[in-house]
Regions:
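Phosphate/dinucleotide-binding and metal-coordinating scaffold of catalytic cores
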Residues: 1-195
Length: 195
């Protein structure tokens, strides 16, 4: 079973606080998700309901059969454009590593999004004392001055999609950080305006 520690980084908190643990398991083609609140979160924030499908009590809670990931986490998942970028990255990596392409789950998509641009107030860690996942000092959200390059990269990925071929790795690498967390089907990317 894979797991991620979920932290709340809400604007009213002084610092990120551990909310609980999100677990994922795939058995015989069937995916299941479970969530367990941290005792301290329940002690101090029991009045905050994160999602209609997670109740504020201790112990493991599972998604309903046939349901994907819990609602509060699905809000942070990429839509079609972000999923396309993450799928193509997986295909390119599989080709380079000479292995079969993995089918990505909602858990994979959640882990694949840049920490800075992930929608909502959740941050994720593998280990309690570890770093937040997908915090990349070298691949930050680009400045507004790189907008033309992002448009070109998006156009190249779209051409590849139309022709049903893998895009070049450089185009995907350029778009993964700024382009996976925003919703919708059309190409888009977040940029920073330093002014």
């Amino acid at each position: 079973m894979e797991r991620l520690l979920v932290f709340a980084d809400f604007d009213w908190l002084d610092k990120p606080e551990l909310v609980g643990e999100l677990c994922y398991e795939k058995l015989r083609g069937s995916e299941s998700y479970a969530f367990r609140f941290d005792d301290n979160w329940l002690k101090f924030h029991a009045g905050i309901k994160l999602s209609e499908d997670i109740n504020n009590y201790p112990g493991l809670q599972y998604t309903q059969p046939g349901n994907d990931i819990f609602g509060c986490f699905s809000d942070a998942l990429p839509d079609r454009w972000g999923r396309t970028l993450l799928k193509r990255r997986e295909q390119i990596q599989a080709s380079e590593e000479k292995r079969a392409v993995r089918n990505l789950s909602s858990f994979d998509y959640l882990m694949g999004i840049d920490d800075f641009s992930r929608m909502g107030g959740f941050r994720l860690k593998r280990e309690l004392d570890g770093d937040f996942i997908n915090v990349s000092p070298s691949l930050k959200i680009p400045p507004l001055t790189e907008l033309r390059q992002l448009v070109l990269a998006s156009q190249e990925v779209e051409k590849s999609e139309e022709n049903d071929v893998l895009p070049e790795k450089k185009w995907i690498a350029q778009l993964i950080q700024p382009g996976t967390s925003l919703g919708g089907a059309r190409p888009k990317a977040g940029v920073l305006d330093d002014r």
